[in-house]
């Protein structure tokens, strides 16, 4: 018998004892001998002096009569370990023994399991424990964080019933389970009382164990009680101090103008570094503590479903919240470097955006590709018919244009020589042209929700989602109709201003002379443009002649995150789209907020926009009203500049590597029309908006694109 079998026998016998339902056992009679008091009962053999077993009531006088065992009333469902949870989520997984090392009395086993194309390894003194550790790692790849019962204990066991993504069970079954560890056996189980009030008792119907039971296996649920606040008004700093006494908080930086200061505090917990920012040091300290509680102890103080990440349908290589916080931190850090720790006059901004690239599962290897700011669009009188002015200087639009420069640079790197091909993010596609390497992903960060449909909601009504202000009684949800007719509408930005308005039915075509005579130049909202990228890709029409469609893997918001509204704006409202060309799809990226939401940026928005792409030595500052820099020079991101890059790459790519065969084009407009699959996908997108009753896409005057290449 090997070590594993011995342990299995031992653990199974212990499990039987622990699982015995003591509540169903009759109370001990005073006449019944206690342990060590009675004489051993006879086994039926002769010579025993033990007394006979008394006849039981209802035995019909037969000594060997046995009562039928009563069916035990099912007690509370015991918490499931990681192995059990993973088996329910992904049944039929095969665990492989990779190695066995160490002496006989202290062996070390390494087991592996493949889940979603990834291999996870676990080690332990027995095969069983090694399998358990492998299962935990696998679960962590798509479930947010492991459970920590000590955090719940510090909260006085007042757990919120919303400790997992229950609102998304139908759409995301993989996120049903948050816990990997069973609670401490010394802790009695606590349950919400069946009367639905806030009291706790040791019996009831709704289990608050770390591993929720799938709805299909339980009785009809009772009314959900309201979320519980931290006991005795404990704030994150107090709760963290109970879990890890004596922590030291460090003041890292102070930035911003006098009326809009931003402080950054940090704390180290269990070797992990956490930052928090806020308008004062106290708030920054609390946010640092809150971030630590969420990451280390799986203790989330804001558990409303709308604040939870909306998982992607594609390959998820990273833990959602870890990725979101890392992307935010990287973009803010790069912007700080570029603006001398926010001291530069051009550090002023309302919205900050950036694109981060990951090339594997470790977010430590992530790289900032672009950073930008801005909230305004060009004034109609400054339109350029040579592609020399930027029409839209909103931060997220500028970040994506900066990303295009990086993609051109990577294509040129691949085309240089064979040595550089390994350094490029592109590789040849078996379908013709180029495609991204498998592990390369791009993540879009925006410091607030994009203007347009994603921002049309009231972030503070009511105070708690599903609760009336100043009340502990459940009311109607905060937004009963997140998809009502007013939602999802295409919207346009206001020229030389902020905010958006719904498109008019007759405004789909704009004319050059009409705009010059005083008609407002209309630009589609950022929500609408990002929804467009989720269909046609972020590479645009020109690059699609060389590369397969590229999509964002995640969209991270620094503030004003609401999962329902953001997912509707990004892709749900066009879920009726059909007949897309090959390789084009309706992309559904990860959507997430960050642990420490950015403070609102009060005051008037600056009239400039800054941009930076990896490889640049400094930021470029553009006047958003004119679409050019202060000296009247065109931006490195303008249509003409990017068209020059495209022509240069087009001259280097062998004809057989083009995804679309194209003769030498004469104008920018003709070059874009040559990308026939891209244009077909765009047409399907516009049709989907119209069929859904959301309005017609408004395009710029065609004269803007009728320019030729001039080196």
Curated annotation (Swiss-Prot):
Where are the compositionally biased (Basic residues) regions? 63-73
Indicate where this protein resides in the cell: Nucleus; Nucleus, Nucleolus
A GO MF label:
RNA binding
From the UniProt entry, list the residue stretches annotated as the region Disordered: 1-79, 176-220
Under the heading PROSITE patterns, the entry gives:
A_DEAMIN_EDITASE, DS_RBD
Q: What is its EC number?
A: 3.5.4.37
Q: Where is the composition biased (Low complexity)?
A: 192-213
Q: Which CDD domains match?
A: DSRM_RED1_rpt1, DSRM_RED1_rpt2
Q: What is the protein's name according to its record?
A: Double-stranded RNA-specific editase 1
Q: Which organism is it from?
A: Rattus norvegicus
